[in-house]
Amino acid sequence: MPVVRVSWFEGKDAKAKKAVAAEITDSIVKHAGTDPKYIYVIFEDIKPSDWAGAGRLYGEEPGTP
């Protein structure tokens, strides 16, 4: 039972999530032979201010100390 978690910045609409879920599911079916009814995709929408990379929050303005 594959469970795939997609963490990304908030703001994607249902159409985008549906397309991504379909692509992920199709890939797992193709490469692992798993029945699609057992494949789950979980979307985690994260505010840019709650995500950091290279020591900086993505929600910060450039040049903010």
Swiss-Prot record:
Keyword Isomerase attached: yes
- Write down what this protein is called: Probable tautomerase RSp1151
Pfam families per the record?
A: Tautomerase (PF01361)
Annotated active site residues, numbered on this chain, are 2 (proton acceptor)
Listed EC numbers: 5.3.2.-
Can you tell me which family this protein belongs to?
Belongs to the 4-oxalocrotonate tautomerase family.
Query: Enzyme group, top EC level?
Result: isomerase
Report the InterPro entries cross-referenced here.
4-OT-like_dom, Tautomerase/MIF_sf
